[in-house]
């Protein structure tokens, strides 16, 4: 693997068509390893002299924010210097020159900034449900497993097992274990395919580290934020939503909320972070594991705009689908509201739609401008009235299917983004039940006549 990666960097100096294997913008361990291993496989199995280059979809300066990535690269003895990052290759220039073919791994929707590259996408390999509205018109291979690295391991072991070296096997093995929470049946993130390929890798390379050792090491590295500034912690695992120019950042924080709130100069850091990136609000969702290795979740909303902050807090506090079961924590600062989250199965993935609806409800119910943090002439009673209208607008706008999704969730590759089987069983409408009963009643006479014969 290391020799291959060194060759990739050299290939970029040549003016020739290249195939770029591109991971997602989060560049978590699964995305990074899947891109590296899939590009390695394609380069080794393609007869023509084509160049396959894995690209990590972040700036090089952002890699230190991903502690598990840095730790694993060091453990596997892959120097960071041989990796290629998004700010080191101009994909748009290559595309305009007709020299780019894209292969997307661990995602299938390009961001708006890369929309022009969609016509260069030749293949997709992903492990999450397809968004048909934005999926590129190309060969798409999707299977709902716990880790995308499992699908890459499958392709290698089925297509060319002889090319698999210990270094690549160790990368795949550790990544699957981390994504699938050490194959813990109680967590339920690992599918049969995930388990199968972990066992296959262990059989081929018996000297791989024990499951417990590598999982514990990777999880510790992932949750280690001791050396990060507040800004780095907020950027480490962040998503952004927006509506009508209003932007809300949602950051996963890997530590106890109490410790996070006690950081020196925190409020100034939060304000500076929002101003630097033009965020109108920031939602911090903390996750850590207690002494019983159970996940603990907490949540905080920082927003200098009173009406927007109260709308967001009200929607989150009163949400029943999903129920966050929030308990407010007293705060001495009016711009910040923290909560204990009683329902630990509700991850950021489930909170994002609530925040989208909160923004919609806010704009539907009030014309209060966001130009200033506090709007003069707006009383608390007026804000409360607007909040009630926003909440009613949201609740009335939710369809039955939105309140209770019809299928259990797909296992994802991070505890931050998904927990297993927390949406309940499929729900039938009255029309569906009536149709089923009608079909049964129509079939009964036929069945009866046949029995008489």
UniProtKB/Swiss-Prot annotation:
A motif (DHH motif) lies at residues 106-108. SMART domains: DHHA2. Mn(2+) 2 binds at residues 30, 106, 179. Its EC number is 3.6.1.1. Activated by magnesium ions and inhibited by manganese ions. Inhibited by dipyridamole, moderately sensitive to IBMX and inhibited by vinpocetine. It is found in: Cytoplasm; Nucleus; Cell junction, Focal adhesion. Its cofactor is Mn(2+). The modification N-acetylmethionine is found at residue 1. GO terms for cellular component: cytoplasm; focal adhesion; nucleus. Keywords: Acetylation, Cell junction, Cytoplasm, Hydrolase, Manganese, Metal-binding, Nucleus, Phosphoprotein. Its main location: cytoplasm. Residues 393-420 are annotated as: Essential for homodimerization. Residues 396-419 are annotated as: Disordered. Pfam families: DHH, DHHA2. The keyword Acetylation applies. The modification Phosphoserine is found at residues 399, 414. It catalyses: diphosphate + H2O = 2 phosphate + H(+). One of its GO terms (molecular function) is metal ion binding. Belongs to the PPase class C family. Prune subfamily. Phosphodiesterase (PDE) that has higher activity toward cAMP than cGMP, as substrate. Plays a role in cell proliferation, is able to induce cell motility and acts as a negative regulator of NME1. Homooligomer. Able to homodimerize via its C-terminal domain. Interacts with NME1. Interacts with GSK3; at focal adhesion complexes where paxillin and vinculin are colocalized. PANTHER family: BNIP - RELATED, EXOPOLYPHOSPHATASE PRUNE1. This is Exopolyphosphatase PRUNE1. It comes from Bos taurus (Bovine).
């Amino acid at each position: 693997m290391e020799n291959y990666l060194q060759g990739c960097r050299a290939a970029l100096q040549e003016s020739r068509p290249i195939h770029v294997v591109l991971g997602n913008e989060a560049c978590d361990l699964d995305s990074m390893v899947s891109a590296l291993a899939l590009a390695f496989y394609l380069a080794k199995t393609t007869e023509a002299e084509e160049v396959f280059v894995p690209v990590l979809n972040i700036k090089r300066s952002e890699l230190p924010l991903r502690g598990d990535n840095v730790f694993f690269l060091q453990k596997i003895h892959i120097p960071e210097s041989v990796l290629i990052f998004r700010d080191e290759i101009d994909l748009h220039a290559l595309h305009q020159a007709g020299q780019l073919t894209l292969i997307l791994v661990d995602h299938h929707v390009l961001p708006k900034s890369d929309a022009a590259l969609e016509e260069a996408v030749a293949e997709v390999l992903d492990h999450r449900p397809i968004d048909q509205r934005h999926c590129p018109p190309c060969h798409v291979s999707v299977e709902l497993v716990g880790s995308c690295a499992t699908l890459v391991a499958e392709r290698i072991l089925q297509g060319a097992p002889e090319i698999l070296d210990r270094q690549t096997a160790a990368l795949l093995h550790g990544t699957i274990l981390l994504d699938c929470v050490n194959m813990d049946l109680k967590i339920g993130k690992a599918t049969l395919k995930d388990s199968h390929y972990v066992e296959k890798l262990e059989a081929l390379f018996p000297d791989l580290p024990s499951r417990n050792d590598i999982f514990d090491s990777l999880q510790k590295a992932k949750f280690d934020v001791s050396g990060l500034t507040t800004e780095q912690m907020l950027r480490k695992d962040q998503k952004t939503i927006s509506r009508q120019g209003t932007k809300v950042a949602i950051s996963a924080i890997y530590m106890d909320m109490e410790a996070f709130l006690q950081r020196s100069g925190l409020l100034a850091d939060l304000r500076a972070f929002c101003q630097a990136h033009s965020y109108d609000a920031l939602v911090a969702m903390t996750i850590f594991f207690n002494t019983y290795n159970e996940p603990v979740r907490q949540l905080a909303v920082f927003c200098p705009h009173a009406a927007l902050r109260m709308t967001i807090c009200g929607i989150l506090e009163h949400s029943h689908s999903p129920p966050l079961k929030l308990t407010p924590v007293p705060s001495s600062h009016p711009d910040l509201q923290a909560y204990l989250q009683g329902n630990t199965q509700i991850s950021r993935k489930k909170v994002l739609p609530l925040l989208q609806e909160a923004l919609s409800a806010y704009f539907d119910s009030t014309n209060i401008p966001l130009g200033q943090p506090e709007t003069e002439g707006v009383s608390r009673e007026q804000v409360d009235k607007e909040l009630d209208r926003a909440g009613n607008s949201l609740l009335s706008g939710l369809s039955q299917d939105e309140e209770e999704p019809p299928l259990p969730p797909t296992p994802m590759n991070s505890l931050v983004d998904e927990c297993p089987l927390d949406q309940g069983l499929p729900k039938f409408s009255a029309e569906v039940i009536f149709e089923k009963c009608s079909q049964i009643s129509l079939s009964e006479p036929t069945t009866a006549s046949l029995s008489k014969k």
